[in-house]
């Protein structure tokens, strides 16, 4: 996808090491030879860990195991790319647990303190022997400076690594939040193919950390879509090593909002990076829904527009077929929507006013906007004060090619 003036080169972002968090990678040749595809993350003893997972009923075996192990104060994360270990039944569960046992044997810990994550092709058994063989190298590579290699090791159809970092001060003491993510297709997270791993040195309890993560995910990863498909393997993990000299962040304290804002910003940047790297994407689309009755309603309207194949192909063709956007708003399910109060813009051009084509709108003005690499669709429902933002991309011929050829 072509870069815009606002599109920073995310590959150039340098992530800050997090004291107490070490990462190591290795090549297991799961799908590609000579490329790191196994990631091991170690959290110092006493770290807190929060996570959210896919809501897909056919969740992958590692998701089931990771959910169980999250309750055991996990210390290690094991991630592999190239194989999703989804749709693999009881053997898949056994393989996921065996991979945790392999890590435990290597580090001298407990298997139920290892959380497994996988991403890649669905329906194929995990190459457990390859992963076992790669683990010693990943363990030897563990380093607080391992973020760059980690960001690349978790990639599948991604064209570039996704990284984000924020530095804040709490009571005059520095706190860092660093994160990586992967995802380019099968992207319609509902945490509920997308993985994100974020770490901080903040001092914060696991319960509050979970609340912060859930709020941040709902405003970021749950507001993006590339193709409307929710992966079997989606997961987002937030780790806190407790190593900062800043005071403990406690519920109700003035420090919670500052920390929440930092996590929000990191996840929002990672979410945007995923959309910008959408499979075959040529355009980045923001959808802003305003004057809705509730934030949920605004998000629903935004997602309905973003999911529409007709809307997405119109963006790819630079075709200002605004009727497709209007139809998406109408079928979003807003109860008792007064269409005479609805207005729609493409960037600065108003295309719909009072529920009908704007009198000053021309096809030429619409085409001018639709040819841009970044476009904002703004919808005013005229029925409240709530708003939401959803991010998506166009649907191109390359998207069809990439996914048609994914296994061939």
UniProtKB/Swiss-Prot annotation:
Biological process per Gene Ontology, one example term: ornithine biosynthetic process
SUPFAM superfamilies per record: DmpA/ArgJ-like (SSF56266)
Binding site for substrate: 156, 182, 193, 279, 403, 408
Keyword Amino-acid biosynthesis: yes
Record-annotated site: Cleavage: 192-193
InterPro entries hit by this protein: Arg_biosynth_ArgJ, ArgJ-like_dom_sf, ArgJ_beta_C
Annotated site residues (Involved in the stabilization of negative charge on the oxyanion by the formation of the oxyanion hole) in this chain: 119-120
EC number of the protein: 2.3.1.35, 2.3.1.1
Key words of the record: Acyltransferase, Amino-acid biosynthesis, Arginine biosynthesis, Autocatalytic cleavage, Cytoplasm, Multifunctional enzyme, Transferase
GO cellular component: cytoplasm
Compartment annotation: Cytoplasm
Reaction catalysis annotation: N(2)-acetyl-L-ornithine + L-glutamate = N-acetyl-L-glutamate + L-ornithine; L-glutamate + acetyl-CoA = N-acetyl-L-glutamate + CoA + H(+)
HAMAP family: ArgJ
Oligomeric form and interacting partners: Heterotetramer of two alpha and two beta chains.
Annotated family: Belongs to the ArgJ family.
Name of the protein: Arginine biosynthesis bifunctional protein ArgJ
Source organism: Methylococcus capsulatus (strain ATCC 33009 / NCIMB 11132 / Bath)
